């Protein structure tokens, strides 16, 4: 993963040529330097790099690669599990609903076991509060608190109401459905809802059944474009424009500011957790003094795991948000996967 963090540092500190597979109907918002850098670093890999200008929703990099060559559908039309990058959205939801506070602390002993369910976690210090749980990407912290939200019978009349509330937050951040960008082939992904879960588990589900969604696995998928837009919503502390790639658009869909459902006060601790991830957490491989806020993700998968990363910079008045998603990356010998 080190080389992908180096890539991100280059993208985030860098600031109209059309790459193969991009639209050809008019001038694009893509920046040649970023696009060429992304394409070069994806050679020999299957994955995508998306960058968006948070100020206006313009897509400034949409680099992709597949075994058959570049294909924008890799970034916009192939929903996959987001892994631990999704913990940012979970934290925002849990804070907004009052399930946790920034000071909520939890022990983690390399994971958690409950009956026949076991979820592992990498070694880190413990207990952790919210910002440290983000920085260290603690699975236990997020799955237990997510499960607590779904099972909270005092705040919600039923688990159906709880999951519907959770889903509404995620949808407000641009997840769970197509955003209707101006590129053909967009897919929306999956956010488990009450109807879906009742069909799948025949009503025999609760917060523990769907623990995996708490850390971005299981019944949740999204595209790299959606992950980049999630980073945009955090960078802007609660708003975004629908991403678009055609310059000087007059379509109001792309000129209308959209607000998330997240409480304004929830953003500060999440931004701080992402800053700490780069400074002393799972993203320290970036090795930069530039004020980057980021979140790593490892996606468990048959064979080699996938790797993901979202980031924005600078921390205040951000100019760029980035998402990287690489399938089956091969870390250098002796380097473990980041969470």
Task: Indicate residue ranges for each PLM-predicted region.
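Sec-dependent N-terminal signal peptides
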Residues: 4-13
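Boundary at the C-terminal end of the N-terminal hydrophobic targeting segment
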Residues: 17-21
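Active/ligand-binding-proximal structured segments within catalytic/core domains
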Residues: 83-92
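A short acidic/glycine-rich loop-to-helix N-cap element
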Residues: 328-339
């Amino acid at each position: 993963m080190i080389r992908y963090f180096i890539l991100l540092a280059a993208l985030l500190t860098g600031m109209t040529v059309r790459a193969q597979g991009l639209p050809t109907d008019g001038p694009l918002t893509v920046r040649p330097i970023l696009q060429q850098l992304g394409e070069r670093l994806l050679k020999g890999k299957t994955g995508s790099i998306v960058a968006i200008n948070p100020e206006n929703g313009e897509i400034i990099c949409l680099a992709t690669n597949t075994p058959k060559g570049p294909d924008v559908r890799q970034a916009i039309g192939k929903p996959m599990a987001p892994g631990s990058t999704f913990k940012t959205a979970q934290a925002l939801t849990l804070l907004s609903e009052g399930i946790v506070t920034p000071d909520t602390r939890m022990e983690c002993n390399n994971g958690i076991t409950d009956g026949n369910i076991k979820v592992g976690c990498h070694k880190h210090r413990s207990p952790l509060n919210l910002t440290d749980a983000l920085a260290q990407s603690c699975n236990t912290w997020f799955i237990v608190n997510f499960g607590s939200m779904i099972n909270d019978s005092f705040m919600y009349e039923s688990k159906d109401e709880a999951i519907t509330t959770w889903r509404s937050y995620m949808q407000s951040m641009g997840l769970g459905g197509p955003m209707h960008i101006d590129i053909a082939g967009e897919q929306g992904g999956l956010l488990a809802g009450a109807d879906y879960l009742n069909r799948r588990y025949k009503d025999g589900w609760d917060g523990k059944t769907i623990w995996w969604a708490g850390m971005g696995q299981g019944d949740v998928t999204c595209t790299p474009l959606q992950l980049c837009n999630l980073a945009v919503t955090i960078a802007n502390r609660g708003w975004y424009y629908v991403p678009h790639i055609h310059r000087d658009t007059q379509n109001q869909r792309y000129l209308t500011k959209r607000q998330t459902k997240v409480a304004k006060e929830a953003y500060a601790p999440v931004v701080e957790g992402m800053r700490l991830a780069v400074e002393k957490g799972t993203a320290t491989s970036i090795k930069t003094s530039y004020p980057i806020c980021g979140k790593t993700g490892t996606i468990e998968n048959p064979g080699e795991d996938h790797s993901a990363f979202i980031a924005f910079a600078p921390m205040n008045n951000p100019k760029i948000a980035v998402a990287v998603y690489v399938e089956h990356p091969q870390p250098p010998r002796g380097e473990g996967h980041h969470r």
